[in-house]
Amino acid sequence: MIDTTLPLTDIHRHLDGNIRPQTILELGRQYNILLPAQSLETLIPHVQVIANEPDLVSFLTKLDWGVKVLASLDACRRVAFENIEDAARNGLHYVELHFSPGYMAMAHQLPVAGVVEAVIDGVREGCRTFGVQAKLIGIMSRTFGEAACQQELEAFLAHRDQITALDLAGDKLGFPGSLFLSHFNRARDAGWHITVHAGEAAGPESIWQAIRELGAERIGHGVKAIEDRALMDFLAEQQIGIESCLTSNIQTSTVADLAAHPLKTFLEHGIRASINTDDPGVQGVDIIHEYTVAAPAAGLSREQIRQAQINGLEMAFLSAEEKRALREKVAAK
């Protein structure tokens, strides 16, 4: 189901949601952190989704053990490097790694700006080693409040040339996008792109708000757009992309099952939607699974899957020249 003549992308992939269980075990031992289990087999139920979670917040708790072992900036650098290695193993040509440095820093009071620098270093080294192209998207974790988001923003701005876009994720119900208008104004002033998690836990109004108030060029998840025909029309007309994450939306109980997922409808409506993983380490999936298992189960035809793959590159925060070069590189292989 993957067209090998086209670039394979994953543009909604959380770096801090893709920490290998084996790495969690090793870092736990290295830093004498008490884990809920002492073997890989018994640890996995604590760090991966085994059965669908009742809601998004419950799903997010599965990420916590991964960041609890980030006891140093070297640990942050390691997981960033391993994210690129994992992308290469999956056959990805281009990834956009979203990460929340405040969340990664929290357990051991690491300097937030230092985490950003460590992630940049690890990703850069990974790209050099494995030949994958990657860009970094800074996440403000609204779950932790406006002040914490401000701290994350300042850390990103200190490395503005290595950050491609700003994202907003976390508890959308408790912390609506309206609290973060000034943050996104500064992001635009820095020349960054804007993508926002919306229409996942909250309804279609959260997507409208992300577009109108925060200036979103893309929407993360966006499943609730299906409830608003005018919104779907607007997304199609304005070519505002939806970063679809099929398995994730089932595991968070945002959508009942893959057959009910709106991605097929979005594509039929002319919306620029792509296939992505979200938190592959926590979900126990990879991009190959999303294309070959999840997408057909969601009712997508072979041609629709190919269109979603094309959309992934079209939506990517790359220049026209970078996209052309990537297409030519893949076609030449």
Curated annotation (Swiss-Prot):
EC number, UniProt record = 3.5.4.4
- Where does the chain bind Zn(2+)? H12, H14, H197, D278
Q: Which domain of life does this protein belong to? A: Bacteria
Q: Which Pfam families match?
A: A_deaminase (PF00962)
Annotated active site residues, numbered on this chain, are E200
Q: Where is this site: Important for catalytic activity?
A: H221
UniProt catalytic activity? adenosine + H2O + H(+) = inosine + NH4(+); 2'-deoxyadenosine + H2O + H(+) = 2'-deoxyinosine + NH4(+)
Give the note describing cofactor binding and stoichiometry: Binds 1 zinc ion per subunit.
Record function comment = Catalyzes the hydrolytic deamination of adenosine and 2-deoxyadenosine.
Record-given protein name: Adenosine deaminase
